[in-house]
Amino acid sequence: MKVAILKYNAGNTQSVIYALERLGVEPIVTDDKDLLLSADKIIIPGVGEASSAMKYLKEKQLDKLITDFKQPTLGICLGLQLLCAHSEENNTTCLGVFDTKVKKFVSNVEKVPHVGWNTITELKSSLLEDLNENTFVYYVHSFYAEKSAYTVAQTDYAGVSYSAALHKNNFFAA
């Protein structure tokens, strides 16, 4: 199985590589169109900032390519943001796979960025079938994806209920 990790100068790529290697998968990290298209699965990892990530994807002409991927594609953290339509982070137009917006947490009560454990609920995807309702997941983020028709798991923080995971056709994001 060929797994490609999209290279676009985002952080957290090495953590994804280590996780895949522990599963016995040797991923390739690339922004080469042919290698991405020939991969069996694609991961868009990320810690970073939405506008600079989108700028890189456009410069490399990967923005249109990504939305046409046919193979299973997973966006993680910033990867989730990029797969949405728009991010409040520097008022960024994103890829639009998921017709939902990414908003910044605003709170006078809770800390932002949110760093900690939350439970996820309303699991609605076969990709989550091995998880139980109220499973704890760890977050480090200042932005969240609004709930939409593509929400397959949700959580809440700072009085906001939001998408913990999204799923549309071959695209999944968490």
Predicted regions: what is each one?
Residues 1-4:
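Extreme N-terminal starter segment of soluble prokaryotic enzymes
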Residues 6-8:
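Short hydrophobic segments within beta-strands
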Residues 11:
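Conserved Rossmann-like nucleotide-cofactor binding loop
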Residues 27-38:
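Short acidic low-complexity segments
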Residues 43-45, 173:
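Structural motif
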Residues 48-114:
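Cysteine-nucleophile active-site neighborhood
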Residues 148-149, 156-174:
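A glycine-centered loop/beta-turn motif at secondary-structure junctions
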